[in-house]
Amino acid sequence: MRSQKLCDIAEIKFCTVSLSRAKQQSEPSNWLACANFLAENVVSLNTSESFITPEREWLLQKDDIVIKRITPTFINYIDTIPENIYCGNNLIIVTVKNNVYSKYVAMILNNKIKYISAESSVGAVMKSISRPDLELVTVPIIDYQKQVLLGDFWFKSIELKKKKTRLIELENIKRNYILNQYILTLGGN
């Protein structure tokens, strides 16, 4: 099985906003920060607005992969995203090229991210990822149909886990409601 470096199959964009060099614009743009990217591929779309002119390459697109540069433990695959939302400081956008399935690359990166961070941060107080370490990540290149099968399986398993978690939350709400109603009918406060 052959492998390729991530830099050969994807464009890697480090988002670093320098306020001292940033240009201002008259209309605000919408930004996502590190805190918006949560585990289990959850992306909170509570954007912040800024009048800083964003770099075009920081625009988030469907099928992008987002990695936190500092203390990464997971990645976020962008399945859907509203228009004109940008990634803010300390985020990395990986845009996979056409010849490789993006969910497959997301699965590989999600499995390797802790190790990449640990290797990249020897002696550092806070673990982070450097460009050279990320560019050199090897991705096994398998038949495209197998990439689709594995990538979709990975993504759907995350979606299933989110639905199971939500079902447990709803069952807890239902249980608490029933118990509270029962207590009220017995004369409790």
Predicted regions, residues:
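Basic, amphipathic alpha-helical recognition segments used for DNA target recognition
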Residues: L6, I92-I141, Q145
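Short, surface-exposed loop/turn microsegments at beta-strand edges and helix-strand junctions
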Residues: A22-S29, E57-L60, Y77-N89
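Short Ser/Thr-interspersed hydrophobic loop/turn segments at strand-loop and sheet-helix junctions
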Residues: L6-S18, W31-E40, W58-I75, I108-S117
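Non-catalytic DNA-recognition/assembly elements of restriction-modification systems
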Residues: M1-P28, A35-E40, T138-N189
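Short alpha-helix capping/helix-loop boundary micro-motifs
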Residues: E49-R56
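A short beta-sheet element
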Residues: K68-I108
